[in-house]
Structure formats: structure tokens, C-alpha cells
């Protein structure tokens, strides 16, 4: 446990002033300077947007970028009133899960893997793209190809991580398509929980009841949900294990 999955240059710390227009956040640096950072998470970020909260940002040296800062993490209080850092950059989720697969941390569930491909067209009309398409090694007793959809998960109630935190038509469609892959292929939904305080995972029924129903239907049909938890630090992210459903 606590394997380092990704390392990066130390992030820049500041304080959240406000988040607006979905993609933007004003952040005060430790020097007192206020900068505008890009926010890759376009969702409501339920339970996270507290003005005055500590945040961390990466900075790009590219002169082509209009906004050099990218908002990466925010510090919130967990159910025990203790600080926990939450990864809010949704673009990180697939990077984390690919690393986890490459490090064989999911082998007990998916078996040994021969190849990993990203963004592969699938579905009846081939207009959808699956996050990861895996082929098993010949030693893998399950010879079926593996389709993996990844969902970034930040919302918490108590010690339970929840997805989604708002109505998601796209997420509903993904569940239907994952179900249709069964039994010819192995169908997996990975919940990338970007905070260390989750003990369980449940679908976010309060935010999207239909998603919850589709989740349970797909699960009953053979879809495999894997809630993967991570711990976020100033210069790295560690593996925090697979959490059970609740």
C-alpha cells in the first residue's frame, strides 16, 4: 500500500477566492498576488468549493498558454474534521488508472494484461470511446477482452465516496454501453477516488437517481465496479487501495 503512482514538481500553494464560469478560479498566492487558474473540473465539485480553502496549482512554462496556472488540489475537512487534500483535475484520473494497471495493482481482478490501448471506439455505432481497452495475456484464465471506463470521484458523505455529484447523461450512456458488452467482454467501471478518506463507494443516487438504477442493473448483469482510492501530496500521488461498495 501507499505506492507512489505519479511524481511531479512541487505544486504552488495558495488560497481559493472563488471559482466561476466553470473553467476559472481566482487564487491568492502566499505572496498576496491574486492569479487566475484554469479549472479542468467543469462539474459542480459538490462539497469542495469553500472560499478561503487552501489549494495547490501547477504552472506551465509554455508562452502559448493564456493561463499558466492549473488548479490541481484543494484541502477540505473530512468526517473526522481532519484536513484531506482532494485532487480536482479530472484529466489526472486516466493517468492514475493507467499507472495502476501497469503496476499490476489490479491483477487480482483483471488478471495479467498483454496490451493497453486508450480511447478505443466501441458500442453499436462505434461513436463512443472507451477509456481503456485491454487484452489479456495467454496465461490469464479469462480470455475475454477488457473494457474500462474511468470516473473521477471527489464527492463524499461521511466516509462514503459518491459518483456522480450531478445528473450525467453521458455517464448514464456509458453504463448502458458497458452492460451491452457483457458477456462477450469483461466490462469494468473504475471509480478514481481522488482523496484518501473514503472507506466505501456508492452511486450518487441523491444527485442522479437514474444513474444509480443503471449502475445496479449493470452490476447485476456482470459489470465490475472497482473503486480505486488515492492520496494526494504536494509533489506526488500514492495508491490507497481498492474500497468496497456500500
UniProtKB/Swiss-Prot annotation:
Domain of life: Bacteria
MF (Gene Ontology): DNA binding
Cited Gene3D superfamilies: 2.40.50.580, 3.40.1350.60
Pfam families, per the entry: SfsA, SfsA_N
Family of the protein in this entry: Belongs to the SfsA family.
Database matches in NCBIfam families: sfsA (TIGR00230)
Protein name: Sugar fermentation stimulation protein homolog
Organism expressing this protein natively: Prochlorococcus marinus (strain MIT 9312)
Higher taxonomy: Bacteria, Bacillati, Cyanobacteriota, Cyanophyceae, Synechococcales
Gene it is expressed from: sfsA
Amino acid at each position: 500500500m501507499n505506492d507512489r503512482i505519479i511524481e511531479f514538481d512541487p505544486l504552488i500553494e495558495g488560497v481559493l477566492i472563488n471559482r466561476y464560469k466553470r473553467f476559472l478560479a481566482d487564487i491568492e498566492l502566499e505572496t498576496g498576488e491574486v492569479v487566475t487558474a484554469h479549472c479542468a473540473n467543469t462539474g459542480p465539485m459538490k462539497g469542495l468549493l469553500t472560499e478561503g480553502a487552501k489549494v495547490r496549482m501547477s504552472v506551465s512554462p509554455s508562452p502559448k498558454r493564456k493561463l499558466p496556472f492549473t488548479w490541481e488540489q484543494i484541502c477540505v475537512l473530512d468526517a473526522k474534521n481532519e484536513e484531506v487534500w482532494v485532487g480536482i483535475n479530472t484529466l489526472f484520473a486516466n493517468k492514475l488508472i493507467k499507472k495502476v494497471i501497469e503496476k499490476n495493482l489490479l491483477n487480482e481482478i483483471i488478471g495479467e494484461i498483454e496490451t493497453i490501448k486508450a480511447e478505443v471506439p466501441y458500442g453499436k455505432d462505434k461513436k463512443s470511446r472507451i477509456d481503456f481497452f485491454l487484452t489479456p495475456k495467454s496465461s490469464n484464465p479469462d480470455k475475454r477482452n477488457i473494457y474500462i471506463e474511468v470516473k473521477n470521484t471527489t464527492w463524499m458523505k461521511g466516509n462514503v465516496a459518491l459518483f456522480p455529484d450531478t445528473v450525467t447523461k453521458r455517464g448514464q450512456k456509458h453504463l448502458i454501453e458497458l452492460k451491452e458488452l457483457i458477456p462477450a467482454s469483461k466490462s469494468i467501471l473504475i471509480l478514481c477516488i481522488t482523496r484518501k478518506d473514503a472507506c466505501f463507494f456508492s452511486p450518487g443516487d441523491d444527485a442522479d437517481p437514474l444513474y444509480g438504477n443503471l449502475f445496479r442493473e449493470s452490476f447485476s448483469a456482470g459489470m465490475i465496479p472497482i473503486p480505486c482510492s488515492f492520496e494526494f501530496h504536494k509533489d506526488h500521488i500514492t495508491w490507497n487501495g481498492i474500497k468496497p461498495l456500500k
